[in-house]
Amino acid sequence: MIKVGIVGGTGYTGVELLRLLARHPEVELKAITSRKEAGMPVADMFPNLRGRVGLAFSTPEEAGLETCDVVFFATPNGVAMQQTRALLDAGVKVIDLAADFRIKDVAEWQKWYKMEHACPDLVDEAVYGLPEINRDKIKAARLIANPGCYPTAVQLGFLPLLEAGVAETGTLIADAKSGVSGAGRKAETHILFAEAADNFKAYAVGGHRHWPEIKQGLEIFAGGPVGFTFVPHLTPLIRGIHATLYARVSADVDLQALYEKRYTDEAFVDVMPAGACPETRSVRGANVCRIAVHRQQGSDMVIVLSVIDNLVKGAAGQAVQNMNILFGLAEDTALSDVGMLP
């Protein structure tokens, strides 16, 4: 059994990790930490886990994380980097669901996240945990940087075009929408029911923290610089990301065949039939990115529609997928749920 610890188990990604890991046949949950809620039974906070998780929250110091095989950080940005080195030195593998190790340019990371990086030497070692790109590197990793939610949907949507070299790379555009759970489990005015319901708005138009992460990936796929515009929006949904992506193609190519071939062996990427429009509810609760590709009115403009559940393929599900790869398990272990309808 894989001994698992979770640091920061009281947020939405933390409880989603617990939901998935509680029924994982190869996992033994050893510790779930929260300084504020130490001593509280996990099931008292999250009744959906009654009968599934018998642990209580503990402080990180009391959790015995160094005895785990792998520790997940479902914490705010800046927490994992303070504790990762000690865990790695103890032989523990680390999967960080925050952004501490995603961006390879440490100065760029510090600019966007407004803090000094505590272990910049580990950034180079960290493997970016997008399995559809880095599966082989994940297998040998000690430290995995789990991708962000927007970056997962956008990168998987653009990947086939850029790998094949058929898209003009100077004007890539991502128009993306997220449910309010993407903002985390905290009290902030803009995600209150009375503010978010019956409303739809753009935010961070001048610059979002996921922009450098996405751009970094797109430039790797393209093999050179890209021009990339990213505009996120907040929608009155709880879960879900819908990314509408725009690119001009420089060649006459069968786009449907291109996408189907690229993802034919990927269990968690579903390329829909030509003309389809994926819906966020079709991936609710599922570790799936559902994609459709269109060429608009016979022009050179390609429109890619990409949907994920921000808490599953955009966070906890992808983290479990990475763990499965890391420990040589079937990739879909504990991740076979279909989307919930209605």
UniProtKB/Swiss-Prot annotation:
NCBIfam families: argC. The keyword Amino-acid biosynthesis applies. It is an enzyme of class 1 (oxidoreductase). Its main location: cytoplasm. SUPFAM superfamilies: Glyceraldehyde-3-phosphate dehydrogenase-like, C-terminal domain (SSF55347), NAD(P)-binding Rossmann-fold domains (SSF51735). Belongs to the NAGSA dehydrogenase family. Type 1 subfamily. CDD domains: AGPR_1_C, AGPR_1_N. Pfam families: Semialdhyde_dh (PF01118), Semialdhyde_dhC_1 (PF22698). This is N-acetyl-gamma-glutamyl-phosphate reductase. The active site is at residue 149. Catalyzes the NADPH-dependent reduction of N-acetyl-5-glutamyl phosphate to yield N-acetyl-L-glutamate 5-semialdehyde. It comes from the Bacteria. Keywords: Amino-acid biosynthesis, Arginine biosynthesis, Cytoplasm, NADP, Oxidoreductase. It catalyses: N-acetyl-L-glutamate 5-semialdehyde + phosphate + NADP(+) = N-acetyl-L-glutamyl 5-phosphate + NADPH + H(+). GO terms for molecular function: N-acetyl-gamma-glutamyl-phosphate reductase activity; NAD binding; NADP+ binding.
